[in-house]
């Protein structure tokens, strides 16, 4: 038996989400149509609203409904510090720590040559313009500690240092509350190398 075309289209749309395979997409589609049509309609309206109203901040590239986002508009922020993150979700996580009071630049990705993602796709030129505005003194590279994140940090670091900017990288180490017994050897090794004087 062939699926109705409307259901097939819904399954395909759900498959576009990261981490959602064909079976998961099909389960979600059936659930929404069978048990939660109101939720499906709400989801549809929310997606439409988001696509119509969200844009990229002219300064930091994060999602916003205004031309300039709330963080970039905040005059209490330290404009000499610029933290580079991969995604708006990473920016939110850093904000939740309440330890950083500078500004941001959101790459909306990371370098991944095998996937066709180069400097242009991560808005490298915009980052360089922003970091070279004469106000920024230090760029904090807060890309993830994956192979691609490390490669991105290395590439950005080399290029920004060549422009005379101070470039720092988030430290790596044992998570707060983490017991050494349960932490992987690479993390422990990095924590040992990045140890600080007390």
From Swiss-Prot:
Alphabetical keyword list: DNA damage, DNA recombination, DNA repair, Metal-binding, Zinc, Zinc-finger
Molecular functions (GO terms): DNA binding; zinc ion binding
Disulfide bridge partners, by residue number: none
Alphabetical GO biological process terms: DNA recombination; DNA repair
Domain Toprim stretches: 80-175
Keyword DNA repair: yes
PROSITE patterns (UniProt xref): RECR (PS01300), TOPRIM (PS50880)
SUPFAM superfamilies assigned: Recombination protein RecR (SSF111304)
C4-type zinc-finger residues: 57-72
Family affiliation: Belongs to the RecR family.
Protein name listed in UniProt: Recombination protein RecR
């Amino acid at each position: 038996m062939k699926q109705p075309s409307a259901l097939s289209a819904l399954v395909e749309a759900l498959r576009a989400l990261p981490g959602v395979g064909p079976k998961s997409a099909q389960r979600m589609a059936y659930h929404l149509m069978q048990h939660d049509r109101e939720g499906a309609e709400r989801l549809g309206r929310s997606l439409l609203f988001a696509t119509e109203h969200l844009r990229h901040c002219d300064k930091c590239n994060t999602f916003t409904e205004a031309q300039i986002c709330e963080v970039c508009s905040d005059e209490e922020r330290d404009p000499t510090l610029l933290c580079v993150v991969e995604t708006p979700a990473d920016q939110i996580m850093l904000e939740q720590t309440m330890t950083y009071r500078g500004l941001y630049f959101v790459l909306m990705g990371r370098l991944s040559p095998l996937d066709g993602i180069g400097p242009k796709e991560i808005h490298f030129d915009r980052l360089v313009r922003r970091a070279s505005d004469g106000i920024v003194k230090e760029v904090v590279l807060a890309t993830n500690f994956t192979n691609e994140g490390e490669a991105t940090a290395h590439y950005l670091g080399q290029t920004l240092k060549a422009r005379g900017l101070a470039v720092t990288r988030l430290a790596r180490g044992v998570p707060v509350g983490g017991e050494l017994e349960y932490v992987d050897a690479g993390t422990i090794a990095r924590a040992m190398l990045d140890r600080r004087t007390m």
